[in-house]
Amino acid sequence: MKWLIRIVLIVVVLVVVLAVGGILMIDSIATAAVKHGAEFATQTDVELEGIDVKLFSTEGEIKKLDIKNPNGPFRDKFDSFMILGTGTAQISAGSLMSDTIVIPKVELSNIELSLVGLEGKKNYEVILESLKRFQGDNPPKESEGGKKIVIKELIIRNITVNYYFDADPALGAIAMGPKQIVIADDEPMVLTNVGAGGVPMPQITADIITDIMVQVMANLAGDLGGHMKGLANSLVDTLGTDKLGETLKDLNLGDHVKAIGDLGVDLGEGVGDLLKGVGEGTGDVLKGVGGGLKNLLGGKEEEKKEEE
């Protein structure tokens, strides 16, 4: 009987050791996958403190994902392009063994983003040029392996933007910064069905970064003017007007509609209709808007002449 008890105890200990070892391995695998996905997507250096998968639940915590600025003057100004301070994810347990992992909800907060313009060159142009590889029907073959991911609901809040811009005559923009501004702190950014159908980790990373940058462009169009015109142009080049329109549709544009239009960027017919619809749905906020938004919506600015 004593030998039987000992055997049972040994088996129990082995099961516990294997279970703990498996959890530790899951943490390591998840950390490596997220880090590699961010590095491959942005083609820059990435640091990740780690991912903690809860022992008896399907929740995970992302700890400080740090995407560095491209090497050179941009990194000299701000070391990091984007820092994700905290993130939590709920995972559908039934999908863990399938080819596509379904994540019902991801919440990201305490994000820091740096925007730098030096001598006509922008740090975001370098990053977006890398992310552009994942748009369209022919993403990099290296990103196609492994499991695919879809996020049903993505919530992003508390984005701190650090910026420094030289004067840029081409954009009609004066020198600004270094300064800091916080957005999405009162009303979080909420997106649904990110990575629809399931996409590889690098693609999810690219989608989340561009989503954040669209939010920043929309929120700061009024504050940073011409400098956001440059970002808007880059987003159009990276995403195309259709995908940019889909992202803007999910955002709460509110009072930013006029400022987005005043950038004078050709965001495409679909986005023009979207902004027009937002204006009509919010008490005709487009009345009195300047020529930039009228041109965006396909209209012509009419000058009123005073009769003498």
Predicted regions span which residues?
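N-terminal leader/targeting pre-sequences
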Residues: 43-70, 157
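N-terminal type II signal-anchor transmembrane helix
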Residues: 1-43
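Short, solvent-exposed mixed-charge patches
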Residues: 306-308
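Secondary-structure transition motifs
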Residues: 64-219, 238, 265, 269, ...
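Short low-complexity stretches enriched in small and charged residues
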Residues: 3-5, 13-24, 58-65, 110-118
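Generic alpha-helical scaffold signal
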Residues: 7, 11, 28, 56-59, ...
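N-terminal "first-domain core" detector
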Residues: 32, 36-37, 45, 96, ...
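A hydrophobic membrane-anchoring feature enriched in long, contiguous, low-charge segments
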Residues: 4-11, 15, 220-231, 235-293
